[in-house]
Amino acid sequence: MAAKDIRFGEDARSRMVRGVNVLANAVKATLGPKGRNVVLEKSFGAPTITKDGVSVAKEIELADKFENMGAQMVKEVASRTNDDAGDGTTTATVLAQALIREGAKAVAAGMNPMDLKRGIDKAVSAAVAELKNISKPTADDKAIAQVGTISANSDESIGQIIADAMKEVGKEGVITVEEGSGLDNELDVVKGMQFDRGYLSPYFINNQQSQTADLDDPFILLHDKKISNVRDLLPVLEGVAKAGKPLLIVAEEVEGEALATLVVNTIRGIVKVVAVKAPGFGDRRKAMLEDMAVLTGGTVISEEVGLSLEKATIKDLGRAKKVQVSKENTTIIDGVGDKANVDARVAQIKTQIQDTSSDYDREKLQERVAKLAGGVAVIKVGASTEIEMKEKKDRVDDALHATRAAVEEGVVPGGGVALVRAITALAGLKGANEDQNHGIQIALRAMEAPLREIVANAGDEPSVIINKVKEGTGSFGYNAATGEFGDMLQFGILDPTKVTRSALQNAASIAGLMITTEAMVAEAPKKDEPAMGGAGGMGGMGGMGGMDF
């Protein structure tokens, strides 16, 4: 086992704080409307230019192991805030730095670290309650666009396209961000349920211009097994032909004689049919078929529930206003399923989302909710260069997460004002002893740090601005982009409550751990072994005399 280097007390804490400062100073340069860019070296290709706090934090590794431990712990604040709320990483880092710096000074002055931590925790709990108190729900598309704009570093086009996407697919809908091929941002919306399976034969195509199979007011047959024998399908086909409607078949597989017969019937115009494979695999496939059944008011033909294909009737089939099938995708639009059943199914899936611990499962479940509840929107980010594309895509991702957080928990005045208002509400807060009171004061001072940094990055004097903001009430604050004082809600400067809350709670959590650290253990650096002698025959081996055996 390698030897360890151990540091205690003030020596350990001071090194840790140095690491925190290095990381935080790099990250906080990006805060606010006039925040600066950070250039990140890449092992190959052009460097990345970003204003995204978590992207900067992830790149930082320090040579000194003890300083690096401090930096990595603050990196955890940024990552956790990003996971919780999708934005607010820079705010969380600034708060953590302020709490840790002041806390370490207090411990060095002889105060009890545990009491300081309790004081900080008490202040943060009260501040979170006050944030929830001043939070307002996002009432309209305009508020959503404003939140997106602020999160995307005051880019109004990004805020607007996210608001448009939410308007199209609903607040439960899935919105994904992709790299576009043009210079402008584009929004593609797929309403209804889309899954990534296309037609099994190009002979099903009936729209030559778009190369799709379009079915108006079709019946929909859902089956969880392979269909290879056409005799099994005859009762359903006869019923559909009598009704004079087209038919979509979604099954594990349609092959051989069955597929050939369907193609012939379609070509001859006897009955218009399109067959596609069911999406997913195993249990996920069954669940998605059930989703389709609920959406279309049909039943999954499955032996598990005592239904066989040859006994299926037209009553077991689902219905929809329109179905469009391309080479890669099938879209079911306006299924006729009972809305109460759809809502119940959505609620059931949401419960599964809360219970799962797997990020992959959670993402797939959220996709299912979106497909049932609204649809899918794709924002295609446009830019003139690849470097700009990556930077812009990061900002769109941040803005999208921020707007989702705003819909979830509401909004508070932005620009660091909400935390300053929370300070005034906690004026009379007291701890059990003087050290706890000092911990409360540390937290209250730290809550000014985001506003202080926004103002400093804008090139103004923080103390003057903070005093003026404190003199005001409600959403009165400072617009760093224009240099004006006024109502932040009128300016459209809003932060999601969830983002501000998560940033404060996560910063306090890590700061509490670092303040109460008394020892640090790292691997001792290895001594460089002397170089071997030159290779001039055996005489060169004399260089080995300096080696330890």
Swiss-Prot record:
Catalyzed reactions? ATP + H2O + a folded polypeptide = ADP + phosphate + an unfolded polypeptide
Where it sits in the cell: the answer is: Cytoplasm
Disulfide pairs?
none
Please report which protein family the annotation says this sequence is part of.
Answer: Belongs to the chaperonin (HSP60) family.
Q: Does the keyword Mitochondrion apply?
A: no
Record's keyword terms, sorted: ATP-binding, Chaperone, Cytoplasm, Isomerase, Nucleotide-binding
Source domain of life = Bacteria
Alphabetical GO biological process terms:
protein refolding
Task: List where the protein spans the membrane.
Answer: none
Q: Pfam family of this protein, just one?
A: Cpn60_TCP1
Q: What is its EC number?
A: 5.6.1.7
Q: Which Gene3D superfamilies match?
A: GroEL (3.50.7.10), GroEL-like equatorial domain (1.10.560.10), TCP-1-like chaperonin intermediate domain (3.30.260.10)
Organism ancestry:
Bacteria, Pseudomonadati, Pseudomonadota, Gammaproteobacteria, Lysobacterales
Enzyme class, first EC level, given as a word: isomerase
- UniProt-listed InterPro entries: Chaperonin_Cpn60_CS, Cpn60/GroEL, Cpn60/GroEL/TCP-1, GroEL-like_apical_dom_sf, GROEL-like_equatorial_sf, TCP-1-like_intermed_sf
What is the name listed in the Swiss-Prot or TrEMBL entry for this protein? Answer: Chaperonin GroEL
An example of a Gene Ontology cellular component annotation for this protein is:
cytoplasm
Role noted for this protein: Together with its co-chaperonin GroES, plays an essential role in assisting protein folding. The GroEL-GroES system forms a nano-cage that allows encapsulation of the non-native substrate proteins and provides a physical environment optimized to promote and accelerate protein folding.
> What's a Gene Ontology MF term here?
unfolded protein binding
Under the subunit heading, UniProt states: Forms a cylinder of 14 subunits composed of two heptameric rings stacked back-to-back. Interacts with the co-chaperonin GroES.
Coiled-coil annotation reads none
Q: What is its main location?
A: cytoplasm
Q: Which residues bind ATP?
A: 30-33, 51, 87-91, 415, 479-481, 495
